[in-house]
Amino acid sequence: MGSRGQGFMLGCCLLLAVTWGPVLSLVPRVQEEQQEWEETEELTSPLDHVTRPEETHKRYSPSLREGLPTSRCYRCCDSNPPVYQTIPPPQINITILKGEKGDRGDRGLQGKYGKIGSTGPRGHIGPKGQKGSMGAPGDHCKSQYAAFSVGRKKALHSNDYFQPVVFDTEFVNLYNHFNMFTGKFYCYVPGIYFFSLNVHTWNQKETYLHIMKNEEEVVILYAQVSDRSIMQSQSLMLELREQDEVWVRLFKGERENAIFSDEFDTYITFSGYLVKPASEP
């Protein structure tokens, strides 16, 4: 090797010494600071894990950041922060807790009336009350009786119009409810009455009469033409109101119509009486 080769080797050695000298001098310092940082980390409580790694690195190795060359980057970081399991806050079941009884509140407003309920069962009979005082005298009661029975001793023949049968003999006429001049019974005591009519037919003539209530034909008494005369009767019950009229009517002369009687015997009778007054229950 010549002098040129030796000079080249010497230049290379000087270049290496200049370049790596500062770096090699920092290695012991980095190792000391790293050991010191590990000892400090062991003494740190678990809550320090939440500290940012950059702050920890700056705190424990400030000289390293200042001494390293600006052309290279060195970073020391902690491991990932621990994951803590989220525990839900405790809940209290207030339905099982019972507090002290409060004060009575104010009375509220009256509500609306409800619907009418069904009728309840009949109650027990109460005790008998005391006897009351005597009342004032009442009105005089009306007569609760009515009866009549009348007869006719003259024969009657039909003509061109209807004829009321008028009677000339009075057997019973209680309180004069039967009018002998008109031949009609007038009701003064409302109620139920019984009436009967008896006549004697005429030979070879028809017998045709009606028992009338006011102007209404109620029942008929009828006998056909016959060679022999006979007694014929009709009866019924009527419910009358006050001022109703009951009478006997002979049919008009479209056909030969007659009833027989004479002055020696009474062949025609008309009777009636009150069975039950309307005022009685």
From Swiss-Prot:
What's the superkingdom here? Eukaryota
Tell me which Gene3D superfamilies the record gives: 2.60.120.40
Q: Which residues are glycosylated?
A: N93
Signal peptide (residue range):
1-25
Q: Any idea where the Collagen-like domain is?
A: 99-140
Sorted keywords for this record are: Collagen, Glycoprotein, Secreted, Signal
Gene Ontology CC entries for this record = collagen trimer; extracellular space; plasma membrane
Q: Where is the composition biased (Basic and acidic residues)?
A: 49-58
Instruction: Give GO terms: molecular function aspect only.
Output: collagen binding; identical protein binding
Q: Where is this region: Disordered?
A: 36-64, 107-136
Record keyword Glycoprotein present: yes
Known Pfam families for this protein?
C1q (PF00386), Collagen (PF01391)
Q: Where is the C1q domain?
A: 141-281
Tell where it localizes.
Secreted
* PANTHER family for the chain: CEREBELLIN-RELATED (PTHR22923), COMPLEMENT C1Q TUMOR NECROSIS FACTOR-RELATED PROTEIN 1 (PTHR22923:SF63)
In Swiss-Prot or TrEMBL terms, this protein is called Complement C1q tumor necrosis factor-related protein 1
- Which gene is the coding source of this polypeptide chain? C1qtnf1
